[in-house]
């Protein structure tokens, strides 16, 4: 099985790349693709860059050049679930855009025109992620809605509006829905694994800088444990 793994920033992919064997690196359009073996599987680890546009470019290039059988999006996120702490993990039950609004044409809030309102992860990948949770010890993981937008959320007013629009949201970040939308259009199975780096509040910027390495490592360990289940 060939697995594509996408993270936005260096701390989100560093442990994965360090753990690979027989790896080779290729850079296309400023995006690095590292191909090799990880946990007994053929993988391509991609550092996409931050935001929905770069994530879309990276996902499209990954699919077109390497033809992966599945894609895992890994990295950090801001937490919205009361029972999760920094470093805990959210496994996608569905993925939505939180900054899209074409409701004037009859679409749901967050739904891009001519696209589904929610992008659903592959059931087998989610099941593998659930099995992988047990190997992480004290780290807690839940399934939940992950929402995506091109903003770092640290404003209580913005947070309140987002929760009004998406009351079941467990985490928000800046790439997953773009990756999921590309996977949807190419019919490539996907799952999103995100570890919390902050709680999407006034302290988020400080928390993010302090905890991004921890969040990136936890998410990477979860991805490796997931791959071992495939």
Swiss-Prot record:
GO biological process, one term: L-methionine salvage from S-adenosylmethionine
Species name: Shewanella piezotolerans (strain WP3 / JCM 13877)
UniProt cross-references to InterPro entries, sorted A to Z: MTA_SAH_Nsdase, Nucleoside_phosphorylase_d, Nucleoside_phosphorylase_sf
Binding site for substrate: 78, 153, 174-175
Catalyzed reactions per annotation: S-adenosyl-L-homocysteine + H2O = S-(5-deoxy-D-ribos-5-yl)-L-homocysteine + adenine; S-methyl-5'-thioadenosine + H2O = 5-(methylsulfanyl)-D-ribose + adenine; 5'-deoxyadenosine + H2O = 5-deoxy-D-ribose + adenine
Enzyme's top EC category: hydrolase
Keyword Amino-acid biosynthesis: yes
Enzyme Commission number(s) from the entry: 3.2.2.9
Residue positions of the active site: 12, 198
UniProtKB keywords: Amino-acid biosynthesis, Hydrolase, Methionine biosynthesis
Disulfide bonds: none
Source species, domain of life: Bacteria
Involved pathway(s): Amino-acid biosynthesis; L-methionine biosynthesis via salvage pathway; S-methyl-5-thio-alpha-D-ribose 1-phosphate from S-methyl-5'-thioadenosine (hydrolase route): step 1/2
Family label: Belongs to the PNP/UDP phosphorylase family. MtnN subfamily.
HAMAP family xrefs: Salvage_MtnN
Protein name per its UniProtKB record: 5'-methylthioadenosine/S-adenosylhomocysteine nucleosidase
PANTHER family assigned: 5'-METHYLTHIOADENOSINE/S-ADENOSYLHOMOCYSTEINE NUCLEOSIDASE, 5'-METHYLTHIOADENOSINE_S-ADENOSYLHOMOCYSTEINE NUCLEOSIDASE
GO molecular function: adenosylhomocysteine nucleosidase activity; methylthioadenosine nucleosidase activity
Function: Catalyzes the irreversible cleavage of the glycosidic bond in both 5'-methylthioadenosine (MTA) and S-adenosylhomocysteine (SAH/AdoHcy) to adenine and the corresponding thioribose, 5'-methylthioribose and S-ribosylhomocysteine, respectively. Also cleaves 5'-deoxyadenosine, a toxic by-product of radical S-adenosylmethionine (SAM) enzymes, into 5-deoxyribose and adenine.
GO cellular component: cytosol
